[in-house]
Amino acid sequence: MELVRIPIIELDKVWSLVEKDIRNALAYSGQLTDSDHVYETAKEDKFQVWIIWDKTQKKTVDKYFGVVVTEIIKRKHGKVCHVYIVTGRQMSKWQHLISKVEEFAKDEGCKMMELIARPGWQKVYNNHGYKKTHVVLEKQIKQEDKIWVLAEDQVEVAPHHK
């Protein structure tokens, strides 16, 4: 089992293999983005796409075990490798491959790794030296219909009342 970073020029060749898993993973993340955004951002070289691959299998569908999407984020005091998506089947066979992403991050000059994940991932990553430092709390904000109101050369947003 190996983790293979997909070069930008090869992304189109594997996209049909990984797109569904990316779409499904994003369905759990507030649905504020979609797989098209991941594809476009990866094509701009702002995301890195990796596939979890077992080359000993005969069929392509059997070789593919999952996908990882990472992002190098530049912050004021250093770079961070953010694991944006990690998903796949038979996780126990490949979870150790996070070390390959860590090597990549080190080569890119990152000072740390980070990810926001569902609670079950904490146990997996604790076994690889990660620790919980924060909790993410979310609340959906319902947007009211708004209309633009013009008054004396000023533009304001006002709630639309029916």
Predicted feature residues:
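Long, low-complexity, intrinsically disordered segments
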Residues: D153-K162
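Acyl-donor binding region in acyl/amide transferases
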Residues: K76-H128
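Conserved donor-binding loop and adjoining core beta-sheet/short helix segment
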Residues: E44-M91
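Accessory recognition modules or surfaces
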Residues: I72, W94-E102, Q143-E152
